[in-house]
Each structure stands twice: as C-alpha cells, then as structure tokens.
C-alpha cells in the first residue's frame, strides 16, 4: 500500500497503528550488536544476512554476543546451500556433488561459486562466500563442529531430493515423505540451533535428548509456510502438499484451485492445518527449556507468527488465490507478546488455538480431530499455567478482581485512550493539511466563489468546453 492508502487504513484500524508504534518506539533489544569490534569480513556477513532475510536478520542481531556470529554464519551457510539447491539452471551432475560436499568448502580458503543464474536472489552470497569461510574458521571448535555436521546432513538430504526430482517426480507422495522433506529443510535447523544453545549454556541439555521437540520446532514453521504458500508454489510448478492428503479431496492437485471445488479445497487445507497443529504442543514444551532471554525471543517470535498464520489460513479460500500474510500491526503485537515471558507467549498460542476452534465447522471431515488438537494446546498451557487456583476461585466468589485483571483493565482503558488520541490527532492533521492546500489554491488564483456558484446550480463537473479543451 502507498502512503495515502496506509494512512486511510490506519484511520479505521488505530489499534494496529498503536502496536506498530509501540514496537518501533519502545522495543529495547536484550543485546545490541557492537560493530566497533567486528572485522571487515564479519561486517560483510551481516550485510548479507540483512539482504537474505530481514525477519531472521532482526532476531539474530539481537542474540547474546556469544551466539551472534555463530548463528549468523550458521544461517548464511545453510542459505548458500539452499541457493544452490533452488537454482534449476544448475545441472544435476554439478549440483549433487556441490550439495554433498558443501561442508568441505567451509575449510577451503577463498572458495566461492559463480555458477548460479544471474537472476538468482542470493547469488552474490555465494560469489563472496569467502567472507563466510573466513569467519567460520574463527569460531570456537564446538560451534564449527555443529555447523559442519548440520551442513552435511542437509546437503545430503537436498541432494537426494534433487536426484528424485530429476529422475522421477519432485512432488511429495506420502505424509512420511512430507515430514522427511520438512526435516531436511527446517528440522535440521532446529537441531543445529539447539546444539548451539546448549553449547553456549543458554538451553537445557535435556532438549538434546528429546529430538521430537526440536524436530517439531522446525516442522511447525516449515509446514505453516507450505500451507500459506500453496498458490505461489503451484504457480512456480512446485507441489509440497502430500498426495496422501489432497487425493482424499480432489482427483488432481490442480483441482484445488478451481472455484467449483472450493469446499473440497477448504477441507483439504483443514487437514494440512491439522497436520501442522500436532506439532504445537511440543513447540510449547521446547520453549520452556530455554534459559536466556534473547535466545527465547529468537525462538518464540517465529513460533507465534506460525500459529497466527495457521489461524489466518484455516478455512480461508484466499490461500488458493494469492499469497496471504498476517497484518503488520498484528505482527508487531505478536512480537511484543513473544519477547516478554513464557506465560504471555502461551496466552498468544491459546488465543489463536481458540480462533481456529471457533472457525472449525461440523461440515469438515476433520472437525473432531481439529477440535481435539486445539484442546490439547489449551490443556498443555493450563497444566503449566493454571488459570484458576483456590485463592482465585475464592476471589471470584467474593466478586473481587485479581491484580492481573486490574492491570488488564488498566491497560485496556489506556489503549482506548491512546486510540482516541491517535484518531483525534489524525483528524487534526487532515483538517490542517486541507486548510493549507485550500490556502495555497486561493493564493495562486483559485476562484472558489465561481466553484460555489456552479455547485449551487447542481453542476458537479467542469463545463464541457473546459473538459474537452486541449492543454
């Protein structure tokens, strides 16, 4: 949207504007990156981090200094791998050995790759990959070992997928294949990140023993993206929804995008959402095992965005027409909720689980299972943070408000006050700008008296001889 369209939108959605302003003005990072002590190659790495992903760049750059550079190098290494895998112009005989041997290039001084097509988005990262290698070699041995191990696993997984796509069919057939694909492209990131957290003593070592927890962290994000991007992927000739699911609802995958099959398509998307929701409980469990605030923020923000995106996509026909995203104001509100504490984050999850449950319909073949999945999220949160204690029950009987309820009422009153203030301020701005524009028009000779006479006659358009006159 343009500036004028944005201004018009936020006049009618002031609460979203308030969330954006709160995040932009009052958000204080737990840690701030200190560029004064960085080498030139490190600065180049952070430049590429900004170019490859603004969202991940923002959360990575707020990490504890101990993990700041290791996580940046980890992300750029996997992004380089992904850039090779995504480029369909690279033949399999070149791509496969590159992917399988990418872990080894991390030890080769000066290595780079110029074989990507010119339009490839992150081509320049690989052209200047020697900067990443230089900084990789300066990391602690334990961090280097984690990055190399995950790079090897992901490279082999991507190579297997590329070979299958070239020799057979790139589409995903079974739910098991779907989970395996998501594991290679996202679950391994969860494993690597967890190992880095534990190595830095910012995560509970027990997280490494519960592989299903960090696996779910990655799969929940990846599956949400696959659900949201179904139209975009289809237009690009890619198909990630497993045939085992969509074949229950339509004959051919492309039938999902036909208007006459809309109800079947919605039921299919509901089953995809259900498949993703089953990871939510384990994600919440994982987040409880993080010990450092910036690491918690790093993990919590994407997860809260994912549950909000699932709620947006659930039984929403728009996903079969275009790529949809949560609103910017809602995203800012979620980021504020995800950077405070576990209880507030869990409440955000509870809110969106209830939204999904509310939109659920008995017409959906998965109605019961979706209800159970939402209830499991509620039950888990209630187990960790009970909503009612004996003291709370007694207070309710007496009609007294708890401190939390009083604080919530105060914040709601403050929000209403802020919203009214912003609406009044925007009204004043509109009036002021209108007066200034009218004043300028009058100063430069505008005849408002003649315009008024024409309006009184019922003429709301200029005379025909003026409209048709050539300038």
From Swiss-Prot:
GO annotations of cellular component type: endoplasmic reticulum membrane
Enzyme Commission no: 2.5.1.21
Subcellular location, record wording: Endoplasmic reticulum membrane; Microsome
Keyword Membrane: yes
Domain of life: Eukaryota
Keywords, sorted A to Z: Endoplasmic reticulum, Lipid biosynthesis, Lipid metabolism, Membrane, Microsome, Steroid biosynthesis, Steroid metabolism, Sterol biosynthesis, Sterol metabolism, Transferase, Transmembrane, Transmembrane helix
Membrane topology, record value: Single-pass membrane protein
Catalysed reactions, as listed in the record: 2 (2E,6E)-farnesyl diphosphate + NADH + H(+) = squalene + 2 diphosphate + NAD(+); 2 (2E,6E)-farnesyl diphosphate + NADPH + H(+) = squalene + 2 diphosphate + NADP(+)
Record-linked InterPro entries: Isoprenoid_synthase_dom_sf, Squ/phyt_synthse, Squal_synth-like, Squalene/phytoene_synthase_CS, Trans_IPPS_euk-type, Trans_IPPS_HH
GO molecular function: squalene synthase [NAD(P)H] activity
CDD domains found in the cross-reference section: Trans_IPPS_HH (cd00683)
Pfam families per UniProt: SQS_PSY (PF00494)
PROSITE patterns membership: SQUALEN_PHYTOEN_SYN_1 (PS01044), SQUALEN_PHYTOEN_SYN_2 (PS01045)
Record's protein name: Squalene synthase erg9
The protein's role, per its UniProt record: Squalene synthase; part of the third module of ergosterol biosynthesis pathway that includes the late steps of the pathway. Erg9 produces squalene from 2 farnesyl pyrophosphate moieties. The third module or late pathway involves the ergosterol synthesis itself through consecutive reactions that mainly occur in the endoplasmic reticulum (ER) membrane. Firstly, the squalene synthase erg9 catalyzes the condensation of 2 farnesyl pyrophosphate moieties to form squalene, which is the precursor of all steroids.
Miscellaneous comment: In Aspergillus, the biosynthesis pathway of the sterol precursors leading to the prevalent sterol ergosterol differs from yeast. The ring system of lanosterol in S.cerevisiae is firstly demethylised in three enzymatic steps leading to the intermediate zymosterol and secondly a methyl group is added to zymosterol by the sterol 24-C-methyltransferase to form fecosterol. In Aspergillus, lanosterol is firstly transmethylated by the sterol 24-C-methyltransferase leading to the intermediate eburicol and secondly demethylated in three steps to form fecosterol.
Major enzyme class: transferase
Main localization category: endoplasmic reticulum
GO biological process annotation, one example: isoprenoid biosynthetic process via mevalonate
Cofactor field: Mg(2+)
Metabolic or biological pathway: Steroid metabolism; ergosterol biosynthesis
TM regions (residue ranges): 420-440
Family the UniProt entry places it in: Belongs to the phytoene/squalene synthase family.
């Amino acid at each position: 949207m343009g500036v004028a369209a944005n201004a018009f939108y936020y006049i009618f959605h002031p609460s979203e504007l308030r969330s954006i302003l709160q995040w932009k003005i009052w958000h204080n990072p737990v840690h701030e990156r200190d560029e004064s002590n960085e080498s030139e190659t490190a600065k180049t790495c952070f430049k590429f981090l900004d170019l490859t992903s603004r969202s991940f760049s923002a959360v990575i750059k707020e990490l504890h200094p101990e993990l700041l550079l290791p996580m940046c190098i980890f992300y750029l290494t996997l992004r380089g791998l992904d850039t090779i895998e995504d480029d369909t112009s690279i033949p399999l005989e070149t791509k496969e050995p590159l992917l399988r041997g990418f872990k080894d290039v991390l030890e080769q001084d000066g290595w780079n790759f110029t074989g990507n097509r010119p339009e490839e988005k992150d081509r320049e990262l690989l052209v200047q990959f020697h900067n990443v290698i230089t900084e990789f070699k300066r990391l602690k041995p334990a961090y280097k070992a984690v990055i190399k191990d995950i790079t090897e696993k992901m490279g082999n997984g991507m190579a297997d997928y590329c070979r299958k796509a070239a020799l057979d069919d790139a589409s995903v057939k079974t739910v098991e294949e779907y989970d395996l694909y998501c594991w290679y492209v996202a679950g391994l990131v969860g494993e690597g990140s967890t190992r880095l957290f534990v190595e830095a003593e910012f995560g509970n070592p027990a997280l490494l023993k519960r592989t299903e927890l960090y696996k779910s962290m990655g799969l929940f994000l990846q599956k949400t993206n696959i659900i949201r991007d179904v139209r975009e992927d289809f237009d690009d000739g890619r198909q990630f929804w497993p045939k085992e699911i969509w074949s229950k609802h339509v004959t051919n995958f492309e039938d999902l995008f036909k208007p006459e099959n809309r109800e079947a398509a919605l039921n299919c998307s509901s089953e995809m959402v259900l498949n993703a929701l089953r990871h939510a409980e384990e994600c919440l469990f994982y987040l409880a095992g993080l010990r450092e605030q910036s690491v918690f923020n790093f993990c919590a923000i994407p997860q809260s965005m994912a549950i909000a995106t699932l709620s947006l996509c659930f039984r929403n026909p728009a996903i079969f027409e275009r790529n949809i995203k949560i609103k910017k104001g809602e995203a800012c509100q979620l980021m504020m909720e995800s950077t405070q504490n576990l209880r507030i984050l869990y409440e955000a999850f509870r809110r969106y689980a209830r939204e999904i449950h509310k939109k659920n319909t008995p017409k959906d073949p998965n109605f019961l299972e979706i209800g159970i999945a939402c209830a499991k999220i509620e039950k888990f949160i209630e187990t960790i943070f009970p909503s009612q204690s004996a003291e709370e029950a007694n207070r309710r009987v007496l009609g007294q408000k708890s401190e939390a309820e009083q604080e919530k009422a105060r914040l709601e009153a403050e929000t209403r006050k802020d919203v009214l203030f912003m609406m009044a301020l925007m009204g004043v701005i509109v009036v002021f700008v209108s007066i200034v524009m009218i004043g300028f028009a009058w100063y430069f000779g505008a005849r408002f008296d003649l315009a008024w006479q024409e309006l009184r006659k019922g003429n709301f358009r200029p005379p025909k001889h003026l409209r048709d006159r050539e300038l």
